[in-house]
Amino acid sequence: MLQKEVLNSKALNFKGLNLKGIEDTVLATIINKKVYDVESLKPNGERSAPLVSLEKALSNQDGRNFILECKRSSPTLGDFCKDFDLDKILACYENKASAISVLCEEHFFKGSIEFLKYVKARTTLPVICKDFIICKAQIDNAYIAGADAILLMLSVLTKDTYKELLNYAHQKGLDVLTEVDTYEDAIFAKELNLKIVGINNRDLRTLKVDLNNARSLAKLFSKDTLVVSESGIHTHNDLLSLKGIRNFLIGSSLTGSEDIEFQANTMLYGTNKVCGITTKDALQAVINNHAALAGFIFCEKSPRNLSVDKAKELSALAHGKIKTVGVFVDESIEKMVAIANDVGLDFLQLHGNETVQTIETLHKLLPQVKIIKAFNIEGPKDFEKLHDYEALCEYFILDSKSPGSGTSFDWGKIPANINKDKILLSGGIGLDNVEKALEYEFIGLDLNSKLETVKGIKDANKINKIFNIIHNY
């Protein structure tokens, strides 16, 4: 954890710093280094990269807009990203982000302007230089490196210096993400009619996080201001809880994950699953819509039953893009293990009367595969069954008594105190009732037969439509 400092003499004499807001905080520790860094900064060269508008990227009204960050370390988490592979990070971000933020502060976040150059050369998205900017030379450096926008922090700068740097950046054609974290700074930003304002949920003086900061300060701005919630987003429900905010800056929660693709899909869009996939077209539509889980059914009674060969073909397409789930109903352990290994499944979904002992055995035989247990809900006592499996399962699914039939159980009977953090709601969810299903705030939905026009074959058009509703909820 970064320790707070008093400002050194060089910082105290540096023109334009918000001394009152910085003194004796962790911000002072960072600025004490930054004033020496900028002293030797001599920007040179010409910009070759085209300018891309951050404002335009965040003006998209279709769903949420994400500024996804390339971040390897922080004062609170230390070196949380051991494998800082920018190519892998960009491959994940490219079809999810509206813009990419690159940490350029070297000492405490271990960033670099070289990272920004690398990213800009490999994306058409707007790129933000995320640094503690205190002088024009840093703006020049960011501009030459290819930044399309910069971050200016009102917690760090005096109001006059902020306006000077804001105008200087705009003269170069750069957008500015202005960061506020107090009521006073938010009012100042509002009076300037700024186009883009970031509300930091982390108090950089204490490093404490409170999502209520964005909830309260966002209300001060008009609908014409592009408000961005920064910091503190760890789950999809965190996003949903910030009603009225459509733009989010997210970093360490993604790059610190062992599986950035799965983490991004679940956190940004929800832990949603489409079950009964039988064709490449359907699987591709599910991938394109950022579902987290693709279900392959291995049950001869189902019209969506897959052969092992077909499942292997689909699994190859899914690899690295979406997690695969093998769905079984009271199948033998031997057969489930064989199929899981042959197909390369990530999850087994048990949709019958499988016992705790069966799951314990599967864990021993398939340590790399996670377990989902589905329950067919008829009455209140069915919810009690979840407790026996709690420690053994990654997720639970609440389904109707006739899975795959397009019918729902009575969602009104779901206990108010049920733990929703590992449950997907299932059973007859389609375009007619998906918004109602989302109101129950489970981590995700399990979708199946209502996404079909022909029985057993998913309709890509219906998949697109239902996920559009989910992403705009």
Describe the role of every protein-language-model region.
Residues 134-146, 182-192, 229-250, 278-289, ...:
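Catalytic cores of alpha/beta
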Residues 144-161, 198-208, 244-267, 291-303, ...:
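Glycine-rich phosphate-binding active-site loops on the catalytic face of alpha/beta enzymes
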Residues 67-85, 126-133, 177-179, 229, ...:
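Active-site mouth loops of central-metabolism enzymes
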Residues 76-170, 174-177, 185-189, 214-217, ...:
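N-terminal active-site wall of soluble small-molecule enzyme domains
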Residues 194-273, 395-432, 443:
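Active-site/ligand-binding-proximal alpha/beta "capping" segment
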Residues 3, 8-81:
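An N-cap/entry alpha-helix motif that binds or orients negatively charged groups
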Residues 72-83, 88-109, 189-218, 293, ...:
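Glycine/Thr-rich beta-alpha phosphate-binding loop at enzyme active sites
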Residues 211-221, 254-275, 308-318, 361, ...:
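C-terminal helical cap(s) of enzyme catalytic domains, especially alpha/beta-barrels
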